[in-house]
Amino acid sequence: MVILITGATHTGKTFLTQRLLEKYNYPYLSVDHLKMGLIRSGNTCLTPLDDEELTLYLWPILREMIKTVIENHQNLIVEGCYIPFDWRQSFEVEYQKDIRFICITMSENYIENHYSEIIKNASIIESRLDDNDCSVEFLQRENRFYREGFCGYGENVSLIDGDYEVWLNEVLTGESFL
């Protein structure tokens, strides 16, 4: 089984991934690690700021890795921002049966009311080098972008709008991953 975890920045994708790793013992692939490896090795001229181009560049690689994992009856969590809204179109139905998907977004009110907590927890799993451009407005815009994009393709989007720990426990105890 493959679990795809995507969503806006600062929504807790990596934290959720870590908790799923602990619960299911599934290995995980951080798309950010793959991205930075390709950039730092000189295998692409793209930069970390080239979000749209990175999605186009990384998705064919990720897609084929996901297919290989499924064909080998293995498990993997794939976590990161670079999953296209129309990702399902890349897989035949037989593959889709072995893929679970979650897109995490936060409501505008949640961001406004919990901004300091969001920033405080930004590096809970991985270190962020620079969060200076991460304003309330930026986070609201990013979350709206992901919510509208994935909903536009009929995907369910998990909305954090209340207590984060309650949301996290609901996701972890839900049936959506098995």
Segments the model singles out, each with a brief description of its role:
Residues 5:
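Hydrophobic anchor at the beta1->P-loop junction of P-loop NTPases
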Residues 9:
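The conserved Walker
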Residues 12:
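Conserved glycine(s) of the Walker
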Residues 15:
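Conserved Walker
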Residues 18-61:
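Conserved substrate/cofactor phosphate-moiety recognition/catalytic segment
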Residues 54-98, 102-106:
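Glycine-rich phosphate-binding loop used to anchor ATP phosphates in small-molecule kinases
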Residues 99-144:
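A glycine- and Lys/Arg-enriched "phosphate-lid" helix/loop adjacent to the NTP-binding pocket
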Residues 144-178:
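NTP-dependent small-molecule kinase module
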